[in-house]
Amino acid sequence: MIQKSFVMMKPDAVQRRLMGKILSRFEEKGLQIVAVKLMQIDEDLAKTHYGEHADKPFFGSLIEYITSSPSLAMVIEGEEAISTIRKLVGATNPLEADLGTIRGDFAMDTGRNIIHASDSPDSAEREINLFFNEDEICDYEIVDNKLIYE
């Protein structure tokens, strides 16, 4: 089933100039980038996005970190995109992430773990709508999809 997922490269990925390397992993897997924007996330958007963590002790430092520098917000589409992206991203704690995953290869700390990816269809829809207007998402066909999907 073709799905859309929200993915965000966090400030540490942007500051460390890892955006191109990370983007290429999604494209090499056969996923399609349908929206992307480099943005400075303000405190209100950060608190809304991470609202589920509001009562946790790390919430303040998470908001401070995510608003400290630009992030790269994306919508990525493909066959079973949500689970495929989660596998590419790796475990939340980089020390538990397998080598070969984005976090396993590039991150060292749970608080600075490079990337966020939607964990379910519901969260993908909510996060996409939070960061993108409908007219910012491109619907286009990749000519080699016939070689990737049956």
Curated annotation (Swiss-Prot):
InterPro entries: NDK-like_dom (IPR034907), NDK-like_dom_sf (IPR036850), Nucleoside_diP_kinase (IPR001564), Nucleoside_diP_kinase_AS (IPR023005)
Active site: H116
Organism annotation: Methanobrevibacter smithii (strain ATCC 35061 / DSM 861 / OCM 144 / PS)
Main location group: cytoplasm
EC number assigned by the record: 2.7.4.6
Any one GO CC term of the record: cytoplasm
Source organism phylogeny: Archaea, Methanobacteriati, Methanobacteriota, Methanomada group, Methanobacteria
HAMAP family for this protein: NDP_kinase (MF_00451)
Cofactor(s) listed in the protein's UniProt record: Mg(2+)
Positions bound to ATP: K10, F58, R86, T92, R103, N113
Alphabetical list of PANTHER family matching this protein: NUCLEOSIDE DIPHOSPHATE KINASE
This protein's record includes keyword Metal-binding: yes
Protein name as catalogued: Nucleoside diphosphate kinase
PROSITE patterns: NDPK, NDPK_LIKE
